């Protein structure tokens, strides 16, 4: 019953397993459905914001690199939310089911609570509740990580240092 529910929710797909010389009904395996589920990754850096829609296998669906002026009359939090909204409008034809938003940026960050205490280059950032504001705005979970920590973790999991002890 649970497999049927997962199939109906498009979480998994059935995959027929062919074994040479086997008899009877062929075995049916399950694979995770990754293409219909997306997450938005955001990287904020000096003067730029990168927004990338990816499926759950991390395959890139669409990406934008946009200017993010260091000084503006509009607070950075409002500008990020505006950029996310405009990204979704521009690429609504490619957007499937959005599961979450992942953000990397430099600065002093409370990753548990999604608060950016300070951020280099953007002087208006002081105790910015980026995670909470974006989660309330979009309705999906938001995860924030320091950019260097995220890059280090990605290198350890998927890069040349994969499987290394130190």
Region locations from a protein language model:
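Glycine-rich phosphate-binding loop and adjoining helix at the ATP-binding site
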Residues: 65, 69-166
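Gly/Thr-rich phosphate-binding beta-strand-loop-beta motif of the actin/hexokinase/Hsp70
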Residues: 26-63
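Residue-level recognition of short loop/turn positions
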Residues: 9, 57, 112-113
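Conserved phosphate-binding catalytic cores of ATP/NTP-utilizing and phosphoryl-transfer enzymes
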Residues: 17-39, 146-166
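Short, hydrophobic-biased segments on the C-terminal half of alpha helices
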Residues: 2-4
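Flexible, glycine-rich phosphate/dinucleotide-binding loops
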Residues: 21, 48, 60, 110, ...
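A short, conserved structural fragment
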Residues: 9-17
């Amino acid at each position: 019953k649970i497999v049927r529910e997962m199939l109906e929710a498009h979480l998994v797909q059935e995959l027929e397993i062919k074994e040479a010389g086997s008899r009877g009904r062929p075995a049916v395996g399950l694979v995770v459905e990754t293409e219909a589920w997306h997450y938005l990754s955001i990287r904020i850096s000096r003067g730029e914001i990168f927004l990338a829609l990816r499926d759950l296998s991390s395959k890139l669906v669409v990406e934008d690199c946009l200017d993010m002026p260091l000084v503006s009359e509009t607070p950075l939090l409002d500008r990020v939310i505006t950029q996310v909204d405009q990204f979704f409008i521009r690429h609504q034809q490619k957007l499937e089911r959005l599961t979450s938003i992942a953000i990397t940026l430099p600065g002093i960050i409370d990753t548990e609570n999604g608060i950016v205490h300070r951020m280099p280059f953007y002087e208006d950032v002081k105790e910015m509740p980026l995670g909470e504001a974006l989660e309330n705005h979009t309705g999906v979970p938001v995860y924030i990580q320091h950019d260097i920590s995220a890059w280090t973790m990605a290198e350890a999991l998927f890069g040349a240092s994969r499987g290394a002890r130190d």
